[in-house]
A protein has these predicted regions:
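Conserved, structured C-terminal
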Residues: 1-195
Length: 195
């Protein structure tokens, strides 16, 4: 037997578990899971599949969508902050200072209106335009085969909200060509992740 610490959480927006095991036993556990998983049609999943699944669910990625340059309020992660308990945590004082300040940028989700698999290739750092003015930059991009759409995350300047951008001409520039996008109000996969 292999002693495993299982956490019910998922980076991809589906019911899942992260398994923690002593590294010397990881190969044994992997082989057990693959063998037993045959009865449940278990299959391997690649990095790009995991990446688009987390994007479909609106999950941000450290290093792409959030970094030391952004804070939880800008990234739409206010729900993850609680000041109710008398508990100190790293960054609490900095967050309290900006808690009531106006955001200078905010994270949004976009889909290209004309989507083809992998075309254009969305990565990150593509400019986001309203008409001919740059209003932000993308942070992640990928093609969703489940929803048949190119999906992108990005930050837009202060004053822009889903409501204010909804009826505007919004574009993402990829390889010097502008592609019209739709601003999403909620993730494509908007399951209740609490159950």
């Amino acid at each position: 037997g292999v002693k495993v610490w299982a956490q019910r959480l998922s980076y991809v927006g589906e019911l899942g578990f992260e398994l923690y095991v002593d590294s010397s036993l990881a190969k044994d556990l992997y082989e057990i899971l693959i063998e037993e998983g045959k009865n449940f049609e278990l299959s391997h999943c690649g990095m790009h599949a995991m990446d688009i699944m987390r994007m479909e669910s609106g999950f941000v990625h450290w290093g792409h969508d959030i970094s030391p340059e952004e804070n939880q309020y800008q990234a739409g992660l206010k729900f993850a902050i609680s000041y109710k308990k008398n508990v100190n945590f790293i960054g609490k004082d900095a967050l309290l200072k900006i808690k009531d300040q106006k955001l200078d940028k905010r994270m949004m989700m976009f889909t290209l209106k004309d989507s083809k698999p992998g075309e254009p290739l969305l990565l990150h750092e593509e400019p986001i335009y309203m008409d001919n003015k740059i209003i932000g930059r993308t942070t992640s991009g990928n093609y969703s085969f489940c929803y048949e759409k190119n999906l992108s995350f990005g930050y837009v300047n202060s004053g822009n909200t889903v409501e204010t951008l909804k009826d505007k001409n919004i574009y993402i520039e990829i390889e010097k060509q502008k592609y019209p996008v739709e601003v999403l109000e909620k993730p494509l996969n908007n399951k209740d992740f609490k159950n």
